[in-house]
Amino acid sequence: MATPATAAPAQAVLGGGSGILLADAAGDVAACTLTTIGHDGAGRLVGITAGHCGDPGDAVIPEFGWDGTPVGTIVDDYPALDVAVVQFDPARVAPVNQVGGMTITGTGSPVDFPGVACKDGRTTGVTCGVTWLTDTVRHETWTQICVMEGDSGAPVVVGTTLVGMINAFIQVPCLSPTVGTTMDAALGAINAAGGVGAGFRPI
């Protein structure tokens, strides 16, 4: 007796911590992590990730549990902060505020030393570490959170408050400090531009 084919899901389930693939017109693909998903002031379904993961116009594809077709597009980026904005097709995406062991209920400011923050990345999952410093000039936080390639864009939270994203590790993954953009700075830049993503609120 033939085994019935498994139907593809009607919508991709995505939230902060989901693995995403970003594909350019040449077919090059990067694997990163979605920082957060929600609606902007105009009601559009949008997300945020690390800017170095792709460029405006690149297709965004869920890495897991999907049929490999795009569900969104990078529509804007902020190179000084290494932040990118994704506009999603609401007919193809079911946004959630919990991925794995991490829940996001709002946004806020990073903690100071020796506060602990955690991230949820597509490569290393949920890991936590002490906050070494927050650079208010460069809008960065330095933490001891373990990250590896593919964790770029991962949400950094304190409790359930989204305070930043993962952008890079210094020299040695999971041993050296990790650098990330603060969510205050990311949302401030997006709001100031007044385009897609302005007025963002997470699911």
PLM regions and their residue ranges:
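Secretory targeting and sorting signals
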Residues: 1-8
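Short N-terminal segments immediately surrounding and downstream of signal-peptide cleavage
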Residues: 8-26
